[in-house]
Design a protein with these regions (language model features):
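A detector for short, charged/polar N-terminal pre-domain segments
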Residues: 1-7
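N-terminal core-binding DNA-recognition domain of tyrosine recombinases/integrases
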Residues: 10-25, 31-95
Length: 95
């Protein structure tokens, strides 16, 4: 996986800090949640993983992995919110 993901994540976190008026705690949680998803992608892929390769089935597979780790419903809901917001941002900036 290339550095594009990390660059986009950094840009996204700066965006939500500057425009969405979210708490530093939320930014920290979102960073951790999205980085956990990126690590999931890294484990699945042997090469670069493109933004447009993420689909509903892959997202469901990731969420199933969270359920398998016995995360609370609140934690899973926050993960979903973080990923939804991140991918909406990626669409908005036309990645």
């Amino acid at each position: 996986m290339n550095d594009d993901w990390q660059i986009r994540l950094t840009q996204y976190l700066e965006y939500i800090q500057g425009t969405k008026n979210v708490s530093p705690h939320t930014v920290s949680n979102y960073r951790r949640d999205i980085e956990q998803f990126l690590e999931f992608l890294r484990r699945l892929s042997t090469g670069d993983f493109m933004f447009n390769a993420v689909d509903v089935l892959l997202a469901r597979r990731y969420l199933a992995s969270l359920v398998g780790k016995d995360y609370s419903r609140k934690t899973i809901a926050r993960n979903i919110a973080a990923l939804r917001s991140f991918f909406r941002y990626l669409c908005r900036v036309q990645v």
